[in-house]
A protein has these predicted regions:
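Core, highly hydrophobic multi-pass alpha-helical transmembrane subunits of bioenergetic inner membranes
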Residues: 1-345
Length: 345
């Protein structure tokens, strides 16, 4: 139903705008609730038991996180009389807010829902969940980061980077792999959030761009699991070859775009004399590199054992839309612009 889809998309835009532009906790909470209610029809749209299950899980987790957030800000208002987002000073409220926003984002140890929900959604809805739905909670985290416990945030960030890489190792479904990739990238964004807000936003924008390029490519080739990646090259060979580079960019390999945020974050952590933290999180990113390499290997180098099956999949003149090609180009070739990005700091 196009009307219902339009209402959902407009509600998503409205909810996100309300949250990121509000100073009052009640308005921020309202925006988050509008977002949650708007995405539910999109998750359950396929009318499949797995989609219904994903929508139910998403609703229960997000409702619990929103309740915790509301409890946090009312507790702060009770003790300090302040409803302003930047005036969150009570320690219990700060702890509750950290838990609430971490649940909204899918940071460890509140990550359990995210891979399951992404697996039950379509690729387009999965893209929204992995990118647009993270923007309002990231904004709230930026606005309140000066009040939050940095030791707790650092531990959560490092465990997110570790678990995001480790849990993705034995996955065969592309959506689950991208979900664990998202958890790992959130760890990188969270670890730098107190020291440099701009850097967190740059990392988030680049992550969204790279993830969008990969989701749209997988949607074009209709690839949902590793075994179908082996035959995807017959549909659009050139796109599949470029997908390998996009995956390696998401892994953070130079000279691709994904190397830029990791380079800047490690540089900033070193400036702040957190060399041990920088070393640990850099080593943990090697776990993620393994499954990105496995995806790239399946996409371009591996052939299925039965040659008769994949020859049937030849598709001639299948067009790739302009958005996908633009995003993939940026995902691969943005690193030369890094001096211009440095000048913004």
């Amino acid at each position: 139903n196009p009307q219902a889809k339009l209402i959902s998309i407009l509600s998503l835009l409205l909810g996100t705008t309300i949250t990121i532009s509000s100073n009052h906790w009640a308005m921020a909470w309202t925006g988050l609730e509008i977002n949650t209610l708007a995405i539910l029809p999109l998750i359950s749209k396929p009318h499949h038991p797995r989609a219904t299950e994903a929508a139910t899980k998403y609703f229960l987790v997000q409702a619990a996180a929103s309740t915790l957030l509301l409890f946090s800000c009312t507790t702060n208002a009770l003790f300090t009389g302040q409803w302003d987002i930047t005036q969150l000073t009570h320690p219990i409220s700060c702890l509750l807010l950290t838990a609430a926003i971490s649940t909204k984002l899918g940071l460890v140890p509140f990550h359990f829902w995210f891979p399951e929900v992404l697996q039950g959604s379509s690729l387009t809805t999965g893209l929204l969940l992995a990118t647009a739905m993270k923007f309002p909670p990231i904004t709230l985290l930026l606005l309140t980061s000066h009040s939050l416990n940095y030791t707790l945030l650092t531990i959560m960030a490092i465990t997110s980077a570790a678990l995001g890489g480790w849990a993705g190792l034995n996955q065969t479904q592309t959506r689950k792999i991208l979900a664990f990739s998202s958890i790992s990238h959130l760890g990188w964004m969270t670890i730098i959030i107190i020291y440099n807000h701009k850097l967190t936003l740059i990392a988030f924008y680049l992550y969204c761009m790279m993830t969008a390029a990969i989701f749209l490519t997988l949607k074009t080739t209709k690839t949902l699991k590793l075994s179908s990646m082996m035959t995807a090259w017959t549909k659009i060979p050139s796109l599949n070859a470029i997908l390998m580079l996009a995956l390696l960019s998401l892994a953070g390999l130079p000279p691709l775009t994904g190397f830029l945020p990791k380079w800047l974050i490690i540089q900033e952590l070193t400036k702040q004399e957190m060399t041990t933290t920088a070393t640990v999180i850099a080593l943990l990113s090697l776990l993620g590199l393994f499954f990105y390499l496995r995806l790239a290997y399946c996409a371009t180098i591996t052939l299925p054992p039965n040659s008769a099956n994949y020859m049937k999949q030849w598709q001639t003149n299948k067009s790739v839309n302009a958005l996908t090609t633009t995003l993939i180009t940026l995902t691969i070739m943005l690193l030369p612009l890094s001096p211009m990005i440095f000048s913004t700091f």
